[in-house]
């Protein structure tokens, strides 16, 4: 249902005094949403083959590009399998996070988030890139340093190593209620790209710092904005309220 909604929704607004119609550019296949829909916590207990079944069902009802939440990607061998299967299914990109398996949801309170060593994660990226057939399929690294309470320098060092490993883009994650730290990262990320003579997209997920606009994020240097799990969150609340009236 989310795939159908994202595929067909069109919102009319104004831009520079002119009426414009806007649509979603792509679909985010969320691990949290997929797990919750099956009654499981978001801790990588849902098997990849089960996730793949959901992915194929969504792709059957949409022609939008799909970005898949790949959790940690497992070990390098498992990630090769993931990349191969997702590419064959028609997925456009996979995002994997640099936590150790099994991961815990980044917004879960009171949980210690353990990160994988950047050298190990970089090797996983290399293995994934080596197995893909098409140059169009993207592997994006999700940096969890700020989620884990690490300093900005840790996030930037990880970004540098992952870019040198051949990753196609970087996602910086934060659970802060204001966007200051991700904007700081974005500015310093551009310096890294210039030093490496690269052009790689930057991704964010403004779930907690949701007052900032797309235009402001774009001006800060972000290329992709993911609105994660919003349809599930609103559907859950609506179903709870309806259930109370039955």
PLM region spans:
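Alpha/beta enzyme core
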Residues: 1-223, 227, 234
